[in-house]
A protein has these predicted regions:
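RNase III-family endoribonuclease catalytic core
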Residues: 2-171
Length: 171
């Protein structure tokens, strides 16, 4: 079954969806993964499920990650700016802008997501996505900036951070 952590949900049947919801309601492995990844506990399981649901899951009873990704994008940028402001205050603004762009780029976020297994928890209905994850893994051997990561990974990284932001507010 594709419900357990470590597998994507490509073409998962309705029984897998029920098991996934049940695991969410029980706390489940997805909650443990998200807590480990973000360092925060997301108290609303619906937000957690939304954070990993790709738009290809149109028949799902929840929204896709897109709105949480939008919120997470802002939170990631703010966190990067805060980190740079306090640790690199002597750098010029143009240099800070370049560093912020680098820290928040799809390549950087995809790499962080890949290292932490974000690609394994994405609920999707895209048959080509698992092979894109494998291709990305091999592209990394040429260097981070030589990659074309599947956009879904940095999107879900941002949406998980967005879920924390929505669930807990700004701190």
């Amino acid at each position: 079954m594709s419900v357990e952590i470590g597998l994507t949900f490509a073409n998962a049947g309705e029984s897998s969806q029920r098991e996934f919801w049940s695991a969410l309601e029980d706390g489940g492995e997805l909650l443990a993964f998200a807590t480990s990844f973000t360092g925060q506990t997301i108290s609303d399981p619906r937000l957690l499920h939304e954070a990993v649901t790709h738009p290809s899951c149109v028949s799902k009873p929840c929204r896709s990650y897109q709105t949480l990704e939008w919120a997470g994008d802002a939170a990631v940028c703010l966190a990067a700016r805060n980190w740079l402001f306090h640790r690199k205050e002597k750098l010029s603004v143009p240099t800070l802008v370049v560093l912020e762009s680098t820290l928040t780029s799809n390549q950087s976020l995809a790499y962080i997501g890949h290292l932490n297994g974000v690609h394994r928890v994405i609920d999707h209905r895209m048959s080509e996505l698992p092979s894109r994850f494998e291709s990305y893994k091999f592209q990394l051997k040429r260097g981070l900036w030589a990659t074309d990561p599947p956009k879904v990974v940095p999107d879900v990284v941002e949406s998980l951070i967005g879920a924390v932001h929505v669930d807990q507010g700004v701190e």
